[in-house]
């Protein structure tokens, strides 16, 4: 669910990365601009206008993704003039081994890493040294991590995940070539900041692996309701920038939130507000949908992700 144009070098003339409404020649961004209060709610619009304040992606990494960082809100305002940074959450939907590489993520500087050393690794393009600066963390289906602005990170090969984040595409990359061998343009490394100021975006506070896991791995909270179970994956105690639930419906359930949300159907089939839904369907639910009626087919319990904007 995206209202944010992708920033891709050499493709600036192409509008891409935007969610489109099925059956209409219309993007979600256009719909929100046309009917902001009906879609997002008056309270949200008063604070964020027609911006939903959230961006959601599905990522399937066939190779390790390049090491990178995103700015905090403070740095985004200072360096890009943006009220949003790019804090994000990863929820692992599935994993697989690729060419002997077990699924993993890289997150946070190890103790003792300095800005000078990190810049040296970049300018010499010593990729093994870069990887050695970060903690390598094995992951499995169901794991969740909050990746705050300023924290260096990377997604390993074989990870299929949902990424929910602040609505920007500010990504500072430190690898000039992808593991597959594709060149990374200068602008895709520094996003216009240059090869010095880009390093202002990193938080150089090193930590032990135990500290990294304590700060950034998230434990879901389970809530049992009539006809369904909610796993609150990202909730206000983790961040107020966005929220994410995993919903399992085994019969009939009525869900409410008082705000807009989005849905990705992962498993099963049934009815959503009287309309058929099935695996791989995606929906945007306007703020006016205060009570959401969901019914699972008898032999196909529904499992879907439901995500929300700023809380």
Question: Which residues fall in each region the model found?
Answer:
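Transition-metal
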Residues: 1-114, 177-222, 244, 311
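His/acidic/aromatic-lined binding-pocket segments of jelly-roll/cupin-type domains
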Residues: 56, 65, 82, 88-91, ...
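Short histidine-centered beta-strand/loop micro-motifs
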Residues: 57, 67, 78-81, 252-257, ...
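Ligand-binding loop in jelly-roll beta-barrel domains
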Residues: 59-64, 72-73, 95-98, 151-170, ...
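Short, basic/aromatic beta-hairpin or loop at an interaction surface
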Residues: 114-127, 256-264
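Loop-centered beta-sheet repeat module
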Residues: 122-174
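Short acidic-glycine-tyrosine-enriched beta hairpin
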Residues: 134-146, 272-292
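Acidic/His-leaning functional-site neighborhoods
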Residues: 214-277, 281
């Amino acid at each position: 669910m995206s209202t944010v144009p992708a920033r891709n070098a050499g493709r600036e003339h192409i509008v891409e990365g935007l969610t489109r409404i099925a059956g209409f020649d219309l993007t979600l961004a256009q719909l929100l601009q046309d009917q902001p209060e009906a879609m997002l709610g008056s309270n949200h619009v008063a604070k964020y206008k027609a911006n939903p304040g959230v961006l959601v992606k599905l990522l399937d990494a066939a190779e390790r993704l390049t090491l990178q960082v995103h700015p905090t809100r403070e740095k985004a305002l200072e360096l890009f003039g943006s009220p949003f940074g790019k804090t994000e959450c990863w929820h692992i939907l599935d994993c697989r081994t690729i060419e002997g590489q077990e699924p993993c993520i890289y997150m946070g500087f190890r103790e003792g890493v300095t800005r000078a050393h990190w810049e040296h690794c970049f300018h010499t393009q010593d990729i093994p040294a870069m990887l050695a600066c970060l903690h390598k963390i094995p992951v499995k289906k169901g794991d969740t991590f909050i990746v705050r602005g300023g924290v260096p990170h990377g997604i390993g090969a074989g990870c299929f995940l949902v990424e929910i984040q602040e609505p920007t595409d500010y990504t500072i990359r430190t690898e000039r070539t992808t593991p597959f061998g594709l060149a990374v343009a200068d602008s895709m490394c520094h996003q216009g900041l240059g090869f010095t100021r880009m390093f202002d975006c990193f938080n150089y506070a090193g930590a032990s692996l135990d500290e990294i896991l304590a700060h950034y791995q998230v434990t879901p909270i389970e809530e049992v309701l009539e006809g369904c179970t909610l796993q609150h994956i990202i909730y206000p105690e983790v961040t107020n920038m966005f929220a994410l639930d995993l919903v399992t419906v085994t019969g009939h359930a009525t869900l409410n939130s008082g705000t807009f949300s989005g849905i990705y159907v992962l498993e099963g089939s049934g009815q959503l507000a009287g309309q058929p839904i099935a695996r791989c369907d995606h929906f945007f639910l306007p703020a006016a949908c205060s009570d959401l009626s969901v019914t699972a087919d008898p032999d196909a319990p529904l499992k879907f992700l439901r995500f929300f904007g700023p809380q």
